[in-house]
């Protein structure tokens, strides 16, 4: 009986040891096969794929094997804070500048995962100033520059009596001339909430300057902070901003005027990006407002008919702060792989990154793939510190953007 009991204890002991060994093996396998996680928030699918392709080349060797990245797309319909709570904190985050990027930079600072300021070496000064720095550590590193632009149909422009489009009045005159041969001379995706907000924000800067943009943003943030996020609340705020004497009055009046003289199509506030693409493909418009990212998404045989430029203002020789959204790489946790990758992306891989994405570099001297990305670099460098997208600097989630955009459409249609 005693022998049986001893044998039973031995079997139990050996079983426990066996289970422990299995658990240790699984843990070791998990650690050895861990992939550094790179996440994307609010970055278009084409830009994600192109950044991923370059990022994967930066993988460092571990146990004689390259440690590949694991990629995650975060839910950008909610705030970044909520998205991270749902998906977990990645090692590395790519994000456009704005409120959510500010939050990510604060997380990086808490984790003490930033970079020394020499990571900004070689960047043009206006871009260096967009970097997020806390306690002498760079927590948000600029790696690419997007840009809100106008695309002008060359054939119609060259056959017109307009020699240059230096001012919005030149653009309007060109559109008037082209009105008889087009359905809508001037277009943008005003049915898309984000595009409406961002193009409108870019126009506010163009006609009223940076201070007007920032004053409006401050009022929006205060409204949101007290929970007034309904369409009617935003409508009341926009009435104040766009009324005579309001910070955004001139931009709103400009779009209303363009609608009145029929250089915007009648369905402008229903137009989506696909509609803009169709109009350009069929030569139904001569000027389109869009981002460089969207410019790159168009087929070459379509966009080759158009020349891109910055959105002009109402006066020459006035300092501009162009709406040129910066994409940041933010290290969210300490780790050799992510740290090494960001250093490469911000410097030696700039040419590859720009060639793959078609966006502008942050380095002042690196070669660029074509004239568009080089022009954006030059324009931003020659202007004041670039502004982020209004949709990102004023809001953190989709519901608030949607409510605001609906209120803005109502204002602009009045």
Where would I find each of the regions flagged by the language model?
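Conserved N-terminal structural module of periplasmic/extracytoplasmic solute-binding proteins
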Residues: 1-100, 353
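Short helix-initiation/N-cap motifs at beta->coil->alpha
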Residues: 72-82, 169-170, 266-281
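Paired acidic/hydrophobic, glycine-rich loop segments that form the ligand-binding mouth/hinge
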Residues: 91-95, 285-291
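Hinge/lid segment of periplasmic solute-binding proteins
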Residues: 97-149
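Extracytoplasmic/periplasmic solute-binding protein
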Residues: 174-236
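Glycine-centered hinge/linker elements that transmit conformational signals in sensory
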Residues: 215-269
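Extracytoplasmic/periplasmic substrate-recognition and gating elements
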Residues: 287-290, 294, 299-360
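C-terminal capping/gating helix-and-loop segments adjacent to ligand/active sites or protein-protein/ligand interfaces
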Residues: 320-323, 353-414
């Amino acid at each position: 009986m005693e022998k049986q009991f001893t044998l039973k204890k031995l079997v139990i002991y050996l079983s426990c040891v066996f289970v422990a060994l299995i658990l240790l093996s699984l843990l070791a396998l998990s650690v050895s096969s861990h992939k550094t996680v790179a996440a994307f928030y609010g970055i278009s699918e084409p830009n994600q794929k192109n950044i991923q392709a370059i990022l994967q080349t930066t993988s460092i060797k571990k146990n004689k094997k390259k440690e590949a990245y694991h990629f995650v797309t975060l839910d950008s319909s909610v705030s970044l804070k909520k998205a991270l709570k749902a998906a977990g904190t990645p090692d590395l985050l790519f994000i456009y500048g704005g409120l959510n990027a500010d939050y990510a930079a604060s997380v990086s600072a808490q984790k003490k995962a930033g970079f020394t300021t020499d990571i900004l070496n070689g960047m043009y000064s206006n871009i260096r100033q967009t970097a997020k720095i806390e306690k002498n550590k760079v927590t948000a590193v600029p790696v690419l520059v997007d840009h809100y632009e106008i695309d002008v149909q060359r054939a119609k422009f060259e056959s017109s009596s307009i020699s240059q489009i230096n001012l919005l009045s030149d653009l309007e005159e060109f559109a008037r001339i082209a009105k008889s041969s087009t359905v809508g001379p001037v277009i943008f995706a005003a049915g898309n909430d984000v595009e409406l907000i961002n193009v409108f924000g870019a126009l506010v800067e163009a006609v009223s300057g940076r201070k007007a943009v920032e004053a409006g943003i401050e009022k929006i943030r205060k409204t949101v902070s007290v929970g007034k996020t309904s369409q009617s609340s935003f409508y009341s705020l926009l009435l104040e901003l766009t009324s005579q004497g309001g910070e955004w009055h001139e931009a709103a009046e400009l779009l209303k005027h363009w609608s009145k003289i029929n250089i915007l199509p009648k369905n402008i506030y229903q137009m989506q990006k696909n509609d803009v693409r169709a109009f350009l493909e069929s030569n139904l418009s001569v000027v389109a407002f869009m981002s460089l990212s969207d410019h790159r998404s168009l087929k070459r045989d379509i966009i080759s008919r158009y020349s891109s430029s910055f959105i002009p203002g109402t006066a020459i020789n006035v300092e501009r702060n162009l709406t040129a959204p910066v994409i940041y790489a933010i290290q969210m946790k300490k780790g050799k792989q992510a740290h090494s990758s960001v250093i490469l992306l911000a410097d030696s891989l700039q040419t590859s990154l720009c060639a793959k994405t078609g966006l502008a570099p942050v380095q002042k001297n690196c070669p660029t793939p074509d004239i568009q990305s080089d022009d954006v670099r030059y324009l931003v460098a020659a202007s004041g510190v670039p502004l982020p997208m209004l949709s990102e600097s004023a809001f953190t989630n989709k519901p608030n953007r949607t409510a605001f955009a609906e209120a803005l459409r109502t204002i602009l249609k009045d």
